[in-house]
């Protein structure tokens, strides 16, 4: 049977739509705290929905990622282009035609694809969208720290059963923007303000052995990026003031090279300021991009829009740092698996993706009356490098580091343990004398974080005001990312490719070039069984601080060749 005949038969089933299915049956609906409904959306109002189309050759993609990321492979560093990835994963002609005809019949207009052809973003009226997706009912909600407006459906949606081989999920229906990361209150026991200097670029550079010469050369095409999903703005004026106060001892750039997305004139957010200021002071004098979500349409998911950008740009920064995270159990399995595939695509192209491990320790939730730890995603993805958090042993001195009790870490309930970390994790499980009860975590899951950096007590400039005591793994992540950008600078100057997906190499080196953090535990369930304690750090890798924090000269020596 020819493609045309198969398509006609399939379209008849799709349009009839009598047999339907829910592509995300395990997607939990819960209105986040602080959000309220403003009621149904006008049926004639237009909204934007994103359709994730089924991809092909994912096993082959996984093999290629392993080959280009493993230093022992002859293919190491021979990354794929965006066009190579597109040729590999793009949906079948039948999938493309079926979905396009289905959307066209429903009245969808202005459908935009990406280079890899595996996402379609279309505009429809609310009336059309609710007919297209039976069960969906679009409401407007407002909430979050900046009183963001979003359009979402509190009810599950259905698709024609005939589309099951062709569509993974539809984005823009259920998931809310992530909440703002927590900040510690200023400690009350500090007696003399002058004693508390806090973490600044000079403190970080001293602790991690960066000299004034450890900056970008300004002669390469090296670049780095941070992505924002918290409806926040950053201001270049804040960056200028931050560097005036804290960047006098090293060469740095005075402004961001490129903003992808809309950058408005509202008040700056602390999170946005933190990411930009510390990425650009750790990765000093390196061209920096910012992915900004403010100004997007109410029905779009900022994180999903960022993934679409990665699938549509052939030339991207080498290092991306991201502070976004959700509980694994709050997301549908098909959504998690598809996002993980997007990370795989990035790894094949030689991009280094760093995600914050989260600020709730091991996490905690109750399942059928039993407490369990609660892993985070994307921190638990096997295709990203996850960054945990530490504190100074003495908060007033530049000393060895200990666990920051909020540092996220644990074991995925979705992804199995990847081969690259098998030895390290098995050794931890065998040797740790402080393991929680086995019922609290999935010992065979992907374990995280992979590395760490200081996450406690940062100075940030936001709205031209210096703010102390900003904390969280959203601070440690851009710091580690900036240091990797400096290593990429040396690799590029030496004719080497950028580091790409770091984890296979990181675990092969068993922590060489990193300060091992061996003291402290992070938080978890406040019950009698574990009494608020999650996992504890120890020699080598652990699920609190990973392999440890960067010692720049040693890490550069380790990662410079091949």
Swiss-Prot record:
Cofactor binding remark: Binds 1 Ca(2+) ion per subunit.
Gene: Tpp1
Cofactor(s) needed by this chain: Ca(2+)
Lineage: Eukaryota, Metazoa, Chordata, Craniata, Vertebrata
Function field: Lysosomal serine protease with tripeptidyl-peptidase I activity. May act as a non-specific lysosomal peptidase which generates tripeptides from the breakdown products produced by lysosomal proteinases. Requires substrates with an unsubstituted N-terminus.
Protein location: Lysosome; Melanosome
Processing after translation: Activated by autocatalytic proteolytical processing upon acidification. N-glycosylation is required for processing and activity.
Full protein name: Tripeptidyl-peptidase 1
Residues annotated as glycosylated: 209, 221, 285, 312, 442
Keywords: Autocatalytic cleavage, Calcium, Disulfide bond, Glycoprotein, Hydrolase, Lysosome, Metal-binding, Protease, Serine protease, Signal, Zymogen
GO biological process, one term: proteolysis
Classification via PANTHER family: PROTEASE S8 TRIPEPTIDYL PEPTIDASE I CLN2, TRIPEPTIDYL-PEPTIDASE 1
Enzyme class (EC, first level): hydrolase
Residues in the signal sequence: 1-19
Disulfide bonds: 111-122, 364-525, 521-536
Reactions mediated catalytically: Release of an N-terminal tripeptide from a polypeptide, but also has endopeptidase activity
Keyword Glycosyltransferase on entry: no
Self-association and partners: Monomer. Interacts with CLN5. Interacts with CLN3.
Primary location: other
Family matches, as Gene3D superfamilies: Peptidase S8/S53 domain
Glycoprotein listed as a keyword: yes
GO terms under cellular component: Golgi apparatus; lysosome; melanosome; membrane raft; mitochondrion; recycling endosome
Single GO MF annotation: metal ion binding
